[in-house]
Amino acid sequence: MDQLTSAARLMIVSDLDHTMVDHHDAENLSLLRFNALWEANYRDNSLLVFSTGRSPTLYKELRKEKPMLTPDITIMSVGTEITYGNSVVPDDGWEAFLNNKWDRKIVTEETSKFPELTLQSETEQRPHKVSFYVQKDKAQDIMKTLSKRFEERGLDVKIIYSGGMDLDILPQGAGKGQALAYLLKKLKSEGKLPNNTLACGDSGNDAELFSIPDVYGVMVANAQEELLQWHAANAKNNPKVIHATERCAAGIIQAIGHSNLGPSTSPRDVMDLSDCKMENFVPAYEVVKFYLFFEKWRRGEIEHSEHYLSNLKAVCRPSGTFVHPSGVEKSLQECVTLFGTCHGDKQGKQFRIWVDQVLPVQVGSDSWLVSFKKWELSGEDRRCCITTVLLSSKNKTVADGLTWTHVHQTWLNGAAASDSASWFF
């Protein structure tokens, strides 16, 4: 978020479970498609916001399980916690706002009178959120009775039922919708109101997102009945809110294209990456394309062709260097030769590569320094290195004028590969 000096081109605010993340997609293909689209076209001028019912603990667990990007802003615990950036800096102003007419002690006291309510795990109990499980046929009556009792005791709370079993009690001012409204107001006060905002969800606790004025919305194809019913009753005449025909992250990509919010073709959907050209030199796009080619080569999804290797050598400066995360320095040309020998070595295996937080900085008239995290997943093994690449856009020997001059990598703490010899570029 701090890298933006002006209004974001697009702000995507997305739920995670069953929206951005498809738990029925073992290969995580729709998520990886979104990742490539975002990093290639949006990362340096837009904002990615994850809005989840998960607590910080469960959110961190999900990040370890799935190939997720790093968001600029994270809204957790059903809109009761807002944090910023890698350091997860909390928004103290939001926390203070939520204290109005909220008393957690009274909430726990009143809910303890209902044996039908089962407390969720301790990690899900937060300063401004008390969470339970409840059977679907009991939910509405309990919510009605609790609302009356809280009002009698001077509290102003909100009760949200979602997922057919989750019941969350929050301050009235909390929730995913209010958290989004707060963010938009804050960004506007800073002169950075996004040009467009797209809200994405699948369940009842996402409904509020679609109530914010001037916000585009997408209910993914697998949206739950509770959200569809809410939409039919409250937003069916809003042309900005659509019900996608694609599941999860694929539905988000579909919504970007449907509403003309920006590029909506993921580099992962391009069959021949060598023919994938941009009108102008876009460093982030080139980085994403390069590592996608690397993945496809090792998975044996493209043919073993000298044509591809020749093109790869052409974009690597003859005197260019690669500093391996282990500290060993090699020539880029030598790396291409080694790369050529590993064609199809991951065929039939779970092997994926994605890049995160691709941020280019122009350091000369035709030179760019691009920093990012490069992730590799091989079976159950996940490895990551912090990567810096020096690119030049002045190369008359190749069609798009691109030259890779220098690549430097260091292992991310706790994410080093046990077999460094198998780590390329």
From Swiss-Prot:
Gene inactivation effect: Plants show chlorosis, inhibition of photosynthesis, reduced growth rate and altered photosynthetic carbon partitioning in favor of starch.
Annotated catalysed reactions: sucrose 6(F)-phosphate + H2O = sucrose + phosphate
A single GO molecular function term of this UniProt record: sucrose-phosphate phosphatase activity
One BP term from GO: sucrose biosynthetic process
Pathway linked to the protein: Glycan biosynthesis; sucrose biosynthesis; sucrose from D-fructose 6-phosphate and UDP-alpha-D-glucose: step 2/2
EC number per UniProt: 3.1.3.24
Oligomeric and partner information: Homodimer.
Function of the molecule: Catalyzes the final step of sucrose synthesis.
Family under the similarity heading: Belongs to the sucrose phosphatase family.
Protein's name in the database: Sucrose-phosphatase 2
Organism the protein comes from: Nicotiana tabacum (Common tobacco)
